[in-house]
């Protein structure tokens, strides 16, 4: 039962806990130290937030002893102090700013806290004098920063500083939603919870506690990002399940995953809790998949030393310890709804060994794991197109007709009609010039041609990779092709490049030079990074296809933004405003929310239209409807309704950000009229982008059943088998040019 003794709003589900929790032997010392430290910082009697009894009942030392079982006594005390500070900050911000709805005061307080966290770039004095603390939160942060940061690399300090700032600043997002009674949509919630929930910050502390920094060379690579994000989501979802009664029932919080799913699906609290637990299990299993399937290739590609590999593995084990230990603490702390507070670890009596074995063997969630690998292609019939919520019209360029003809000739010149994958009638049917004409209706004819070429090239490659590399499980060939494509994107137009040997290479080499030649060096680097991200995502798709694996829902959606080419869209738009919009604005919650909502909306629309093409004709698994069917175990119509509801919620979030969050962002950053006008134009460009993509999907002859039958029949002709031999092969194989 909960600490109040009242009926629980739902029964806690059966959790997936594959690793046993361990307890640090220095617990008693950490408890005593935490009490003295909190009192010394002014967090107890007289603070108006906690009394000694509160701290003792919450027992953060027990949390840290479970989540950091191997560190020594002094390190455990330091880590415990950090968690005392974080939880005190959360309760302090609630009492002082959230309850009164004082956004201005909250923003001022958070700005001051940043002064106690020097970024620590190379050459910076991390012990630089900070202002005199005015309250327990500032005093605690000043003390902890000075005790933690010295001795760490600039990369770790920068990452830890960002995650700590996010933890603090995103409290304003929660405050804003409370003030207007708004419950976030599921995708928005996951993204914001990572920041305000603090688990990415906890991951940084794990590096500190285990004495194993993640090497800077790989700290931003996808496998490390996924490990961190899976860790964060799992920690947050678990906390949401245990804290629902207190946060939602007593404190009026709206930032809770159970409430988010309850609101989105219109289901009961119990049903929402069960679904959140399934998502928690899925994220933990994604962590395991990433550890075993993605880390080893990354080690080889990055050329890490044995010591660096050991550091990454030690860090990953630390995250694993945190998951199991955090679960054990939630079962005990009086802060949460639980049935076993204060009881010995694990069940006792007859059958207890079997219960523990079930958790260790991962039987909980086993059916979901199996279902992700056993999906088979099958006839599905024509894709059903629902009524989409899209409040923005499409305007078309007057250069459209000319661009259509020029694009077909460009396809021919690049050799896209010579490899058995595309032919002229097919390219005409696809009509990418129509999409470009709506994305930028004011573009010159030349710029429209470049835009259409990018869309055509990207789709050609998107058709090529699954057929040539995914279906054949030729991961080496995919990586070889990837390396050659990267070699064709010099930052200087005059730089020598290898001669292209196939259509996808010729297309990239041509459109790359036409795009970057007029750019400034900074713009070229930004755009190169965006295209690199898209290339990375294509390899991820091939790897999933080779493993015959339906992705985790969160991982899929986040990667879908990239596979859809969204980073290229964002980078080109940002270049137009680089001179008037400060770079840090693009990292703000409002800007990231706006972009992600737009990108998700259009990527999911593509999944709705392409369902029959990808599932029935191509046997692919990377489609949000397939992911939804697999995760929920539901039929196509139900999955379609869920995806369309998600699209609608993302579009409404886009509108909400523009109406509510952009004005606040303008004030928070003190932006002048020119910067505000530039960002308003960017928002209008995103509206045009979404509307153009919707118009193109409705009119293209790429997804209709009669066109699929015609296109598929011709692609299946013997010419395809002959042409496949001319497609890229791994460098060590005969025939590579």
Region locations from a protein language model:
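Alpha-helical, largely C-terminal catalytic domains
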Residues: 1-737
């Amino acid at each position: 039962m909960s600490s109040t003794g009242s009926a629980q709003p739902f029964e806690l589900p059966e959790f997936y806990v594959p690793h046993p929790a361990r307890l640090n032997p220095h617990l008693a010392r950490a408890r005593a130290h935490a009490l003295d430290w909190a009192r010394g910082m002014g967090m107890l009697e007289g603070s108006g937030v906690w009394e000694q009894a509160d701290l003792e009942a919450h027992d953060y030392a027990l949390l840290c002893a479970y989540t950091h079982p191997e560190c020594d006594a002094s390190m455990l005390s330091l880590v415990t102090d950090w968690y005392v500070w974080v939880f005190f900050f959360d309760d302090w911000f609630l009492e002082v700013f959230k309850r009164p709805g004082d956004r201005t005061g909250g923003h001022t307080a958070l700005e001051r806290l940043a002064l106690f966290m020097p970024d620590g770039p190379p050459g910076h004095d991390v012990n630089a004098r900070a202002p005199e603390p005015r309250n327990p939160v500032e005093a605690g942060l000043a003390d902890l920063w000075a005790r933690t940061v010295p001795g760490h690399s600039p990369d770790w300090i920068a990452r830890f500083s960002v995650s700590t700032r996010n933890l603090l600043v995103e409290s304003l997002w929660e405050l804003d939603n409370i003030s207007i009674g708004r419950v976030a949509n599921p995708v928005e919630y996951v993204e914001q919870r990572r920041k305000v929930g603090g688990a990415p910050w906890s991951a940084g502390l794990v590096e500190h506690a285990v004495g194993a920094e993640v090497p800077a060379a790989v700290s931003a690579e996808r496998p490390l990002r996924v490990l961190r994000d899976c860790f964060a989501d799992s920690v947050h979802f678990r906390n949401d399940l245990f804290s629902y009664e207190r946060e939602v029932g007593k404190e009026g919080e709206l930032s809770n995953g159970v409430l988010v799913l309850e609101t989105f699906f219109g289901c009961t609290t119990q049903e929402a809790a069960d679904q959140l637990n399934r998502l928690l299990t899925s994220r933990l299993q994604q962590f395991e998949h990433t550890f075993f399937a993605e880390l080893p290739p990354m080690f080889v590609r990055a050329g890490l030393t044995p010591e660096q590999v050991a550091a990454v593995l030690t860090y990953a084990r630390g995250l694993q310890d945190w998951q199991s230990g955090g679960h054990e603490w939630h079962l005990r702390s009086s802060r949460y709804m639980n049935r076993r507070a204060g009881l010995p670890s694990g069940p006792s009596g007859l059958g207890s060994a079997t219960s523990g074995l079930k958790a260790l063997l991962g039987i909980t969630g086993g059916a979901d794991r199996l279902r992700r690998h056993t999906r088979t292609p099958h006839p599905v019939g024509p894709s059903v197109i629902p009524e989409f919520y899209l409040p923005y019209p499409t305007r078309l360029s007057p250069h459209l007709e000319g661009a259509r003809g020029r694009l077909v000739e460009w396809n021919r010149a690049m050799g896209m009609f010579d490899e058995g994958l595309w032919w002229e009638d097919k390219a005409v049917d696809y009509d990418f010039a129509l999409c470009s004409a709506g994305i930028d209706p004011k573009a010159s004819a030349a710029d429209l041609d470049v835009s259409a070429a990018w869309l055509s090239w990207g789709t050609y490659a998107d058709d090529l990779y699954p057929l040539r590399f995914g279906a054949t499980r030729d991961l080496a060939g995919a990586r070889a092709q990837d390396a050659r494509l990267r070699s064709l994107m010099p930052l200087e137009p005059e730089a020598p490049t290898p001669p292209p040997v196939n259509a996808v290479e010729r297309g990239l080499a041509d459109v790359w030079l036409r795009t970057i030649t007029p750019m400034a060096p900074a713009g070229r680097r930004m755009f190169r990074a965006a295209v690199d991200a898209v290339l990375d995502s294509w390899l991820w798709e091939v790897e999933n296809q080779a493993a015959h694996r339906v992705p985790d829902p969160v991982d899929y959606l986040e990667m879908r933004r990239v596979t859809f080419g969204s980073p290229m869209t964002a980078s080109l738009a940002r270049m137009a405003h680089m001179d008037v919009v400060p770079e840090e604005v693009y990292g703000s919650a409002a800007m990231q929310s706006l972009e992600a909502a737009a990108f998700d909306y259009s990527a999911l629309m593509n999944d709705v239209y392409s369902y029959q093409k990808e599932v029935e004709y191509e046997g692919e698994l990377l489609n949000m409807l397939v992911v939804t069917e697999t995760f929920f175990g539901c039929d196509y119509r139900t999955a379609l309704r869920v995806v369309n509801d998600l699209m609608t919620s993302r579009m409404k979030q886009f509108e909400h950000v523009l109406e509510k969050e952009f004005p606040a962002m303008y004030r928070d950053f003190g932006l002048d009229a020119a910067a505000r006008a530039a960002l308003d134009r960017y928002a209008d460009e995103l509206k045009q982008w979404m509307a153009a993509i919707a118009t193109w999907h409705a009119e293209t002859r790429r997804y209709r059943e009669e066109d699929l039958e015609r296109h598929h029949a011709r692609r299946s002709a013997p010419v395809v088998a002959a042409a496949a031999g001319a497609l890229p092969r791994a460098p060590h194989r005969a025939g590579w040019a």
